[in-house]
Amino acid sequence: MLYEKFEYNINNLIGNFGLSKIAAAVSGGSDSVALLYLANIWAEKNNIELSVISVDHNLREQSKQETHYIQNISNSLNRKHYSLSFDHQNNFSNLQERAREGRYDLMTNLCLELDILVLLTAHHEDDYVENFCLRLERNSGIFGLSSSNINWYNNIQIIRPLYNIPKSELVEYLVSHNIKWFEDESNSSDKYRRNIIRQKLAKGEDYIKADIILQQLKINDLLDNKFKPELISAIAEAVKIFEYGFAFLDLVKFDKFSNEVKVQIINFLLIIISGQFRAARFYSVEPILKLITQDVNFKNTLHGCVINRIQNELLIYREFGKKLPESKILLDKSVIWDNRFRITRNQETPNCFVTHLSLEDYKMIKKQLDLEPLKNLSCKNHNAIIFTLPIIKILEKVIAIPHISYYDNDMWNFEVSFAPNFVSRFTHFC
């Protein structure tokens, strides 16, 4: 019975993807162990290569035991197992969020290396209920309260085939098949708000959980039928994103959309232009929306971006501030720099690296730069934007700025494209 429900879910979620490979994120907990066994049956039935990925966060003593256990199960099922390690660097600030991001970075990067397009995770019905309660406490809007069974991360599709299966059914499945699992001690700690909500839900009547699920479904329907199409229309009509890594928002067209969608549009642009993975909080975006309604020009900074109103348009471009992007050595044919730009070399170029333009560099080569196209496109903000673009150097010398076709030698040839690592539950930028 459980497998039939799982099979129906995964077939509906994947659709006509035509997969030959798939990966499953598996820890030692009951949810993901059940996912592994169910996914194995499905993969065998559909002649699909299943890879198993575990991430050790190096936070609990038994985590290595769990990874070893999953490796043994994978071996017994003739499935490849990959063990990854998250380095928390002894920084325990906002650890849950950082560990989650680190985990997904590691897993999706491995998927890209293995040419795997879909990653299965073990989020089940109880997780969705807890998430709804957490977001309700934070006064989230329609987008925040909604849930999704398909997400994107690092251009990998994240699929949750257990979304309508309660944890109790997964545990029952494991017990009936005499399959062992590990309990995470941190799940019983009052240190985390999620655990407190979980305990309250466990003590409540069944109708409370059923009512939350019903509310969630209503919100999801409203999002799918009204707000998601509106968001897509808003992006298509009001947003222009340029290869230089900046964007313009047409405020006249922007004005006709709902406030819920306006918040998402601003966040969409902030994530893409900043190269960050997380959206800005609503309380940070709200002042920008208020400024827009005042119909006066302004210049603010938020979320690693400069937001500059110029008449009826909003220009958004990268702001480095105190945190400059890391330099990247061009060892391979291409690299991603600042989580936004892909730089490709078309010839052997030893000892070169990608970095940002310094003021000293700019002074030395200023007279050789043709900034007219950038000046025209950016409403004369070229002098700021030029410092946000990738440049290629050998030692201390700038040899290329591909965006503006600057090369100090005819032998150099580099390509650059704007390729932000955009993460969203509602839209996918690829």
Swiss-Prot record:
GO cellular component: cytoplasm
Major subcellular location class: cytoplasm
EC number: 6.3.4.19
SUPFAM superfamilies on file: Adenine nucleotide alpha hydrolases-like
UniProt keywords, alphabetically: ATP-binding, Cytoplasm, Ligase, Nucleotide-binding, tRNA processing
EC supergroup of this enzyme: ligase
Annotated ATP binding sites: S27, G28, G29, S30, D31, S32
Places the protein is found: Cytoplasm
GO biological process: tRNA modification
A GO molecular-function descriptor: tRNA(Ile)-lysidine synthase activity
NCBIfam families (UniProt xref): lysidine_TilS_N
Record-stated family: Belongs to the tRNA(Ile)-lysidine synthase family.
Function: Ligates lysine onto the cytidine present at position 34 of the AUA codon-specific tRNA(Ile) that contains the anticodon CAU, in an ATP-dependent manner. Cytidine is converted to lysidine, thus changing the amino acid specificity of the tRNA from methionine to isoleucine.
Domain observations: The N-terminal region contains the highly conserved SGGXDS motif, predicted to be a P-loop motif involved in ATP binding.
Protein name per the record: tRNA(Ile)-lysidine synthase
GN (gene name): tilS
